[in-house]
């Protein structure tokens, strides 16, 4: 038996197929994964993401600590409520994990991945040496992601007037507390939506209200195809500790200025940048029948080979798509080996669908 979120019993009651994910028993789907995917793209759906790790960072040197820990710069946040996407790097420039950090009234809130919890907490604690900072893991919270073009409208109808007002006011990539709830306009689907952190004891009741109001529960299967269509990386597949953010389409998350900010992994990244020899993460589109899968070989004529990191059938585009790490000189055409046969693929920017609209 794996770890269970506060919503486990409710998932079972709703007919979810439960699977192991990073040591957690999580819903894969509640019937039709494809229908759950379409529901999020066209209206909205709700995901249990309570397995994610939430850490509050406070203390007089909290800002300096995070400026050391993260490749992106929390000084960019500017005002309470703003959010920032970043990576934690090791000294070799590899990605320890990717995360979102919010500037709160009392410090910062960091949300990291579930499958990397133990190593992330250990890394954050090790890097805190020498800083006057307090790290508090918030195991008392559950987290629901309500995603889709109508997510905010439907959600605001089910909460208190103060929380509804906050939902209406939030701009993309903002998150603020209202009582003991923390409501953020963030997500992992390429659609508008909310991620709500609330006391674990209140989560089953709120999920019941959402489902009762017609908001469909969605599982890990739909979450994966949605994030792939949006071109959003999955840690452990599209990047890990052996991969530089420069080779994972995450170069935009590295804050090079100010030059004096010596974040972990900076020197390694500077050397990689100067050498200019890092591969790149691209999108692939299979125009023929077949399915692109992780670890399939990508061949670029006259240049070299790469590998698919994430691949699946796209319900929105009705064709197979993938993210792949390929040589930097790769153009707009390549081939992928599927069951011993080579198939032509189109090379595109690593983002296929945003806000329900195809980008390819």
Swiss-Prot record:
One of its GO terms (biological process) is glycine decarboxylation via glycine cleavage system. The keyword Transferase applies. Keywords: Aminotransferase, Transferase. Pfam families: GCV_T, GCV_T_C. It comes from the Bacteria. The keyword Transferase applies. GO terms for molecular function: aminomethyltransferase activity; transaminase activity. It catalyses: N(6)-[(R)-S(8)-aminomethyldihydrolipoyl]-L-lysyl-[protein] + (6S)-5,6,7,8-tetrahydrofolate = N(6)-[(R)-dihydrolipoyl]-L-lysyl-[protein] + (6R)-5,10-methylene-5,6,7,8-tetrahydrofolate + NH4(+). Its EC number is 2.1.2.10. Belongs to the GcvT family. HAMAP family: GcvT. The glycine cleavage system is composed of four proteins: P, T, L and H. The glycine cleavage system catalyzes the degradation of glycine. This is Aminomethyltransferase. The lineage of its organism: Bacteria, Pseudomonadati, Pseudomonadota, Gammaproteobacteria, Pseudomonadales.
